[in-house]
Amino acid sequence: MWPLMAPCVSLIPFLPGLSGARVFYVRDLSQYFWGRYLWLRRAWLSGEWPLWDPYVGAGQAAYSDALNQMFLPPAILARLIGGEVLGFNLWVTLPFPLAAVGAWLFFSRRFSAAASAIGAIAFAVCGPIVSTGNAPNLSWSVAVLPWALWGTDRVVSAPTTRNLAILAASIALQSLAGEPVTLFTTLALVLVYAATIGDRARSNDLAGATRSVISTGAASALGIAIAAIQLWPTIHASSLAERAGSITTDGWSLRPTALIETVWPHLFGNFFETRSLADVPWMPLLYTGREPLLFSIYFGVPLLALAAFGLAGNGDRRWRLFWVAAGMIGIVTSFGAYTPIYPFLRDHVPPFGLFRFPVKYFVVTAMAVAAGATAGWEGLERTIAGRDETRDLLDARRLTRARLLSIAFPAAIGSSVLLFAAACVYLSAPTAGSLAVFARALGDEKGTGAAEWMLRTVRQDAAPIVLVSFVATALFALLTVPRKRFVAVAGRGLLGTLVVADLLVRASGINPVLNAAHFAEPEWLSHVKAYPDARFYVGGKREGSLSGMDIDGSRGYVDAPGLTGSASRAALSIQAAFYPSPWQAREILTFDLPVLWPKAFSDMSNRFFDESSEARERLLDRTGVRYRVLPQRRAGDRVPLVRIPQFYESFLFDFGDTVTPRVSIVPTSRVVAQVRTQVDALFESGWDSRAIVLVDRDVPPTGTRGHAVQPFARIIEDSSNRTLVEAGVGPQDGYLLFLDSYSEDWRATVDGQQATIARADGLWRAVRLSPGRHHVEFLYRPRALAVGAAISLGGILCLLGLVLLGTRHRYNAWIVWSS
C-alpha cells in the first residue's frame, strides 16, 4: 500500500488535465511547449524524425535543442499516447508520480515504508516541485533526481554491476531531459553523498570512501556517455550561440524575503489571477522584475516542522548534516544576485557562468525538506510510551531539541501571522507606513501602492495559515513525547493527513487547465499558409512576450471572451503564434528560448528591436516576410486582411511580392567575409538584395552546363530534413539564394554533383550554378549528432556489458549455491 500511495497522491493536483478536453497552459506550456509537442508528434506519427525545424527562426536545428526531448524514451512514449491533448497532458503529468516512486525507493532504504511514503509525497507534491510542471524539461529532470540518489545509495552500499547500471541509467535519463542546472546539481550531490554517506564514510575508511566516489563518478560518466546523443549536439550548439558569450545569469534570482512564501503562499501576489505585473506590485520586487519562475515555493508549516524534527533529532548524524547542508546551499544559491556568493561562483567557476535562473537550485532544498520529513516521521513512530530511545544523555538532548523546535516553529509562525494580520486591520496607518518603507527599500519608487495592496490581501489570506500552524503546534506537542500506542497512531494519522492535505490544497492551482478549443490553430494563419514559402511577423512580439511599447506592437491587449488572468494570457500566446511549427507557418523573428541558435541570428534579432521603422522594413523585405501583424498606423494605406483576436489595434497585412522570395537566382555576388557585416547590411539602404548577394567566399559553379534560360527558382519538394529546388540560370553563372538559415551541416548537390554552400547575406544558404536548368537538393546531415550517437552507442554497449556481467555472476553464484 505505501509504495502506491505516494505516486497516487502526486497525481491528484494534475487530475483536471487527464482528459482530452482541457490543456495545461501556464506560461511556457502555451507559448512554446504546446507548439513543439504538436509539431514533433505529428512528424513522428507521419513517419518522419525531424532534425531541422524549417518554420521557426527561418529554420533552426531541432535535434540539438534538448527542450524537444527527442531522445528521452519515456517522454517520447508519453507524447504518443492517446489524442493530442491527452498526450500533451501526460507529458506534463508523468514526471510527478515518477518522482514520487524514486523518492520512495531512496528513502525506503533507510526508513520505514510509511515514513518513506510521507517523504515521497513531501517531495513530489511540495510547491517548488509541482511548479516545475510549466517546463517539462525541468520537471522530467527533477523527477530523476531521487532515482539518481537511490542508485548512488545502492552503489555506496554495494558497488555491484547492477547498482552501477542503475545509477548510470538514472544519470543518462536526467541528461536526456534537457535541464543543465539540475543535471549539474545532481552530479555534485551524488558525488558528495558518496563521499560522506555510507558504511565506509561512517567508519572513516578513507580508501573505501574514495572507492565509493570513484564508482559513483564512473557510473555517472557512463550515464553521460549514454546521453551523448543529446548532450554533444547541445554543447556544440551552445558553443556557436550567444550562450557561449555573455547571457543574463541573474534573472529569476530568489530574494531572501520571498522565503516567507514557503509558509504563506502568494503573499506577494498570485500570478494566475493578475492581468499584469502592475496589479501585483510586490512580485517584481522579489523576483528580479518579473513573475516567479517557480509559481510556488510552498512547503507549509506542518511539513517544515516535521522536517525540523527529523533533521534535529536522533537519526543518523551524517545523514542529517548532509541534508541540512544541502538544503542551506540550495537556498543560498537560489538567492543568485542577492548575495555575493553566487555572483562569485558565476564569474570564477566555469559551469555556473553557463547557467541561467539560480532559483532552480531550490529543488535541492525541496529534496532536503523531504529527507527531513522522512526522518521526522520515523522519529515520531519511535516515540511510543514504553520504548526507550534515549539511551544516553546526548540522545536525550537531541530529542529535546527536536521536540522544542517542532513545537516552537509552527507556534512562532502562527503567532507572527496573527499579529501581522491584526496590525493590518487595527493599526492600518502605521503598518502601511512601515510596508511602504520596506517596499521602497526593495526598489519600489513610492511604496504606497504596494502597502495598500498588502493591507487588502493579508486580511483574507491569514486565517488558514494561522489555523494550520496552531493545529500543527498541538499535534507536535502531543506526538513528540511518549504516548500510548493508540494515541500515537491516531495522532500520526491526523498529522499525516494535515501535511498531505495542506500540500494538496496549495498545489491544486499551480498547474491549471484551459479548454482545448483555445489551443486551436489561429484562424489568421490560414492567409499566411496560402503561400507556403512566405513568412510572417507579429509586431510587438519580442523576448518571449508581447510589448505594447514596441513601435510595431499593439498598444494594448484584451482578454479572450470568458477568460481572465493567466488563462487569457495563454489564449493570447496561441493567437500570437509564439511557436508556429505545428501549423506549418514560417517565421524569422522567433524567440530563442534555450539560447541555442547561431550568434548571427541573435545579432540580427537584437539589432532589429533596436532599429528604426525604416530599417526594420528593409530587414523584413529582404528576409521574405510577406505577412505582417501591425497596427494600421504602421501599414500605411494597405487594406488589412483580418483583425487579430485579443490585439487591441493590430491587423494582418499582405505586403505582396515586394519582398524577396524564399528561393531566387541572384546574378551578382560580392565577397564579404565578416558575418556581422553581412547581417548589418540587411538593415542598411543602398543595396538591392535581389540583384547582389553577399557571400563569405567565392565558390565554384556547379551543375551540368546547359542552354541558358530565363532565371527562375521554385521549390518542388520540401520537408524538415530535405529540400529539392528546380532552378534555371541565364548565360552567366548565378547564385541560387535560399532564404533558410545557414548551417555547416547542410549538404547540397546540383544535378547529382556535390556543391559548396556559401553563407549568404549573413543568414542564408547560397549555391553557385552554371547556366541552364538544374535540380538542387539540400540534405541535413548534422555531424554533431553522428558523433553523439557514436558515443551513446559505446555507452549503451558498456551498460549492457555491465548487466550481462552481473547476470553471469549471479548465475554462477546460483550454480554454486544449488550444488
For each feature predicted by the language model, list its residue ranges:
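Glycine/proline-rich low-complexity spacer/linker segments in large multi-domain proteins
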Residues: 5, 712-715, 781-818
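Membrane-proximal, cysteine-centered motifs at transmembrane boundaries in secretory-pathway
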Residues: 343-353, 714-795
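Hydrophobic alpha-helical elements and their junctions with loops/disorder across both membrane
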Residues: 240, 383, 755, 795, ...
